[in-house]
């Protein structure tokens, strides 16, 4: 492989640290996604990077070691007492040729883009830095910016890191003053502020020699305070270049993460919790799905007069209800193509929750996406202690066959006024959603 820049002859080795134990999702490295262990998806992504000459998995667990070796890939057994993934990688790096370039790829990133790896390696090969790492846009207030598990990074005009933190940074001072000194309110009302934030992605590129030097340094004050080992490098004067990821990756830390990644790999659909910035697309899907799916069923003038802005305002107001949730389904460049929202029932009966809306654009119906979204919503309800579920549907709705397929039974009837006409509706119920 030809490498350009300061070190044209150095080989590039991707090392993937993989532990079996995990506090939130034990054994995740071997959990199957589309019939293949998670760790092997990460291996294949790393192997697809054009700048990478060799891929190794570094593990202390024989089960992971055997799974990787049996797949025809390289694995190395390491000591069990390493305090971090960097130390595990350093043990492997000791046996690599001097001048090697090391890529630290997190084992629980089965969607890491090969292009992201290439971008980071190419930045390292240009020289002048000690470490290259990766960032991507931050888009969610509560799920990301205020989440201490999501590490934020700020960098200078030259692209070099200034600081990493679990706290939100930088601080939107002027915007906060416009909203009574409340930065959260500022971010809720001025979503364009999010372009100033970056989320750190835990991929690193460094020379073999710098890695060995780094792991021999004692822990530093800020590193221990924030529990972020990259601060040890900054506190010791390292130059860390930050490059943008090519596409978003998803680290698998929870069962919900695993389900999301599985849907993407198996079906190409990304089902996730809705964010504030999704609501305009959601309102558009709501109106368009009605206009296209219910043509000939409800009056044309009612469909023509449906307002996306009114739907958008309604969804924005509902977001403040602590018992309200929304999930969206996104499909590649098409963006959001379906959604569901649910919460405290408005229908009569003894049900714990109600689905208020469940819509997909017609071209994405009968694709299996609806069933995946429905099951994900149900699992989230079960996690929150919900046992039973209801929804209402127009008698003539084309969606009724889907509700029947998902095990719903008709438990009542009602009517809705659409325009100047009354339309018969049916109420579906599920008594035990844990069985869905």
Task: Report residues per predicted region.
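N-terminal glycine-rich phosphate-binding loop and ensuing alpha1 helix
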Residues: 8-58
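Conserved active-site alpha-helix within GNAT-family acetyltransferase domains
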Residues: 371, 396-412
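Conserved acetyl-CoA-binding loop-helix of GNAT-fold acetyltransferases
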Residues: 36-40, 360, 366-379, 404-405
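Acetyl-CoA-dependent GNAT
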Residues: 273-279, 287-297, 301-363, 374-376, ...
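Conserved catalytic-core motifs of GNAT/GCN5-like acyltransferases
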Residues: 390-394, 409-426
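Conserved core of the sugar-phosphate nucleotidyltransferase
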Residues: 114-220
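Conserved GNAT acetyl-CoA-binding A-motif
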Residues: 381-393
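Short phosphate-binding loop-to-helix
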Residues: 56, 62-122
